[in-house]
């Protein structure tokens, strides 16, 4: 049945070392942070190359009727996936009967996919373009062989498993002797030692379940309904309830203001 929800795969055995990793050495990294002199609590919201402003974000959950169920307000420089855990936990506690969540591509992360599918629920998201080398081989030309746990490159060479890094990504590396004479190496890697490294998250299988849901008819219809539900909530909030611009300063005041507005809507 095409409407059957994707099911989590069996947990694979990880043959990596079980020894505890040492704590990372904290390096003093200098970075430029834009801070408002009027409201230091807000953050710089960036959306592509066309939108950049100091703002707050209202991470909002609504039901199929467009009724706001919960909201989390953060500075504009906080990624959408950061407040997800708190929102998700509160929603499933209040409404345990919920079986599916629909969200945009910002929420398609390994952690979020594992959290939702691990609870026997379904996450339907938009397509998320893989981040690959500009002008290089397409991402889908690197094929993962689940049986042998290796990556096959566009030239049909094997990249064997090397290690699992601290961020939860399994690293697969090529043979530099083969890559040194590869005719398409310029499309693959600019590494001086001729080693191509491909990473795959240990929870990638859960991300693939989200892709499966994207092609399932029932979840396709649910995703298309976003424009009539959550997007309509944001549109009405901005156009009819004066929420296009922040009227207060300070995170606490803005949070109370947003919750009061959504309660009235």
Question: Which residues are covered by each model-predicted region?
Answer:
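Anion-binding and metal-coordination hotspots
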Residues: 1-265
């Amino acid at each position: 049945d095409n409407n059957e929800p994707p099911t989590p795969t069996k947990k694979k055995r990880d043959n990596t070392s079980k020894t505890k990793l040492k704590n990372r050495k904290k390096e003093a990294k200098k970075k430029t942070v834009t801070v408002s002199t009027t409201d230091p609590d807000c953050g710089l919201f960036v959306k592509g190359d066309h939108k950049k402003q100091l703002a707050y974000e209202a991470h909002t959950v609504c039901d199929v009727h467009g009724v706001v169920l919960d909201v989390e307000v953060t500075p504009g420089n906080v990624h959408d996936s950061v407040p997800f855990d708190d929102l998700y936990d509160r929603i499933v506690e209040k409404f345990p009967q919920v079986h599916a969540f629909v969200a945009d591509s910002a929420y398609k992360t390994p952690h979020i996919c594992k959290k939702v599918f691990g609870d026997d629920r379904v996450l339907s998201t938009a397509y998320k373009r893989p981040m690959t080398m500009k002008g290089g081989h397409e991402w889908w030309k690197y094929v993962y062989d689940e049986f042998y746990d290796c990556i096959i490159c566009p030239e049909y060479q094997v990249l064997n498993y090397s290690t699992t890094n601290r961020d939860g990504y399994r690293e697969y590396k090529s043979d530099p002797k083969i890559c040194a004479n590869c005719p398409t190496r310029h499309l693959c890697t600019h590494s001086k030692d001729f080693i191509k490294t491909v990473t795959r998250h240990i929870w990638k299988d859960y991300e693939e379940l989200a892709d499966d849901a994207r092609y399932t008819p029932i979840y396709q219809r649910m995703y298309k309904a976003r424009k009539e539900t959550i997007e309509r909530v944001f549109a009405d909030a901005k156009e009819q309830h004066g929420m296009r611009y922040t009227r207060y300063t300070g995170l606490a005041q803005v949070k109370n203001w947003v919750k009061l507005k959504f309660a009235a809507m």
